[in-house]
């Protein structure tokens, strides 16, 4: 982990509320790792690392003042990272993600043999070379018709996680969890999750967990 000062290169709108933010600087990270970025007068926020147009990039869903500042106003952004356990796996995998994880998919494609399914509630405003599904009905249809893979990795909303777990139970499924966190180093304990081995923390034990490790009830 190191202190970061990132220079925003440009932003690209993905859909109604999600943007890709590209940076000038290169960061050495493993697929699935994340950074904590600082916003004015607000707590740090976690963003999974990835690539877009061969630049280090993050996907940002605008939910409030902090994420709006990153997309619209920021020129330089302080932070620290990379953080988390990352992920590398042999064989052929399927990433099932929301638009907030688009840049992560590019990091996986650089290191592993993967296909990608992107599920969104609203239409995309940029062309994608992934399989896409807009709306719950289309997403469920495409999820049910996916072929067989050696492993699966899901990153999206809690609802997406639960749907994928029900459809893929019995297979080798991993989840990159998105939980609130204030520090990224295990100090604030805000990102606790229940596992079959007890309480773990997304920032230090994850963010990637096997599906059969987690307590789903």
Curated annotation (Swiss-Prot):
Keywords: 2Fe-2S, Electron transport, FAD, Flavoprotein, Iron, Iron-sulfur, Metal-binding, Pyrimidine biosynthesis, Transport. Disulfide bonds: none annotated. FAD binds at residues 66-67. One of its GO terms (biological process) is 'de novo' UMP biosynthetic process. Pathway: Pyrimidine metabolism; UMP biosynthesis via de novo pathway; orotate from (S)-dihydroorotate (NAD(+) route): step 1/1. The keyword Zinc does not apply. PANTHER family: DIHYDROOROTATE DEHYDROGENASE B (NAD(+)), ELECTRON TRANSFER SUBUNIT, DIHYDROOROTATE DEHYDROGENASE B (NAD(+)), ELECTRON TRANSFER SUBUNIT-RELATED. This is Putative dihydroorotate dehydrogenase B (NAD(+)), electron transfer subunit. The gene is pyrK.
